[in-house]
Amino acid sequence: MHRVTVTLDDDLMKKLDAIIEARGYQNRSEAIRDLARIGIQQTSAHASAEHCVGAMVYTYDHSKRDLPRKLTQSFHNHHELSRATMHVHLDHDQCLEVTILDGKANEIQHFADHIFSERGVRYGRLVTIPTSGDGHAHD
């Protein structure tokens, strides 16, 4: 095992300590090891060509110049990944979208990264779940 030193700002340290207490970790090292494993697992899953389903959640400012058009074009360019989208108007300018995706993990991640990087997209989160294959038909 290797010993490393990490510098954290006060706010991040408070949040880490809250996680440690809530989950019952014996010490910070144990918590940081688990969080590192989770991050590595997520990164590996998103980089693979394995089949998965996912939920992409993001908010955006629909009044930003050309943003709705750019988002629509991105969805058309990746139409094979998108299964369904729910659109909610949060206020006069902000919208929330939840999209169910189905395809290779690396392609889904690439699509989500493209959406999240658009100017005017304020928050983005992708959750993926590995599946056993390329989908199936119900008999």
Curated annotation (Swiss-Prot):
Note describing how the cofactor binds: Binds 1 nickel ion per subunit.
Function of the molecule: Transcriptional regulator.
Name by which UniProt lists this protein: Putative nickel-responsive regulator
HAMAP family in alphabetical order: NikR
Species of origin: Rhodopseudomonas palustris (strain HaA2)
Assigned keywords, A-Z: DNA-binding, Metal-binding, Nickel, Transcription, Transcription regulation
Residues reported to bind Ni(2+): H76, H87, H89, C95
One of the GO biological process terms: response to nickel cation
Gene3D superfamilies: ACT-like. Chain A, domain 2 (3.30.70.1150), Met repressor-like (1.10.1220.10)
Top-level taxon of origin: Bacteria
